[in-house]
């Protein structure tokens, strides 16, 4: 009897469930996947090299364009890294506003993931409901920074500008009525028979396997390990806030969905706490080598105007050394490593994207599953190619 040959199938990069520009070469035995080979690099823009040719402030907007569905988390990691090199202390109000917007960013990210994962397996309604809520959060982004996506709001030394007076009030109102929309999606999906058939038991992964592959964030927590940098290595003011770490049991697509839904609820609680505890005060460091003089000062003093111009054209010089900062981004641990040679530009910047580690395990996770399950698996990984290809 002749040997049966496996079939090669190209999934993407134009496929709607590829979540961007993923080209997946599948080796298939009938409908069953023998091997899945992700081809990356179609969105490579050389970000790390571009950063070497920019000042520390000019490099910041590149981070918005990595994981472009949760931009402020990336800015946060970069700002913390530069602040480590500068040994700069950030005012307490700026810390609260940073955490407030990072948690809104987490909600923004998980809303997109849950709705698009549901769409990938055929549930259209959550996308229509949740995009309306995302739009409201993007409006808060716009009112704070002037941009819906590429905010450049969290900067080394603090934040770009204080929030408008009524914005905190509007966020509080939104957070009050928002949980009912999450309850609606919960009701629609969590116990839905078809949803469970498509996600329960698909690409199960143990804690050991997750750690071996370098998983972090919801991917690791869904496997059952309560590892969250906001608790285990607290940064900013997370040690003063009260929240739980949701974990899964089986590490399958269904558990990843449950963990993200629970994280949305935890983020709602964190946003409420930030609003309640929000102090008054400065939003930028007083160190004039890093933050510019105020507009009022520039109108009165020629030196202040020159100082402002030099700070934005030439940039500040960062002491020689190296630093690594990592934050609990919505997709996992997002790290930035910077080497400074004492000039106004980074000598080297290395970005640790969580999605890269998750995508490399796709072959391991998809093996033995059906072709139809690939969409469910990719949806549960929560990958964005801006950060994977960099």
Swiss-Prot record:
Membrane topology: Peripheral membrane protein
Alphabetized InterPro entries for the sequence: NADH_Q_OxRdtase_suD, NADH_UbQ_OxRdtase_49kDa_CS, NDH1_su_D/H, NiFe-Hase_large
Domain of life: Bacteria
Locations listed in the record: Cell membrane
Known EC number: 7.1.1.-
GO MF term list: NAD binding; NADH:ubiquinone reductase (non-electrogenic) activity; quinone binding
Pfam annotation, one family: Complex1_49kDa
Alphabetized Gene3D superfamilies for the sequence: Cytochrome-c3 Hydrogenase, chain B (1.10.645.10)
GO cellular component terms listed in the entry, alphabetical order: plasma membrane
Catalytic reactions of this protein: a quinone + NADH + 5 H(+)(in) = a quinol + NAD(+) + 4 H(+)(out)
Keywords for this protein: Cell membrane, Membrane, NAD, Quinone, Translocase, Transport, Ubiquinone
Similarity comment text for this entry: Belongs to the complex I 49 kDa subunit family.
Record function comment: NDH-1 shuttles electrons from NADH, via FMN and iron-sulfur (Fe-S) centers, to quinones in the respiratory chain. The immediate electron acceptor for the enzyme in this species is believed to be ubiquinone. Couples the redox reaction to proton translocation (for every two electrons transferred, four hydrogen ions are translocated across the cytoplasmic membrane), and thus conserves the redox energy in a proton gradient.
Subunit description: NDH-1 is composed of 14 different subunits. Subunits NuoB, C, D, E, F, and G constitute the peripheral sector of the complex.
Protein name, per record: NADH-quinone oxidoreductase subunit D
Gene expressing this chain: nuoD
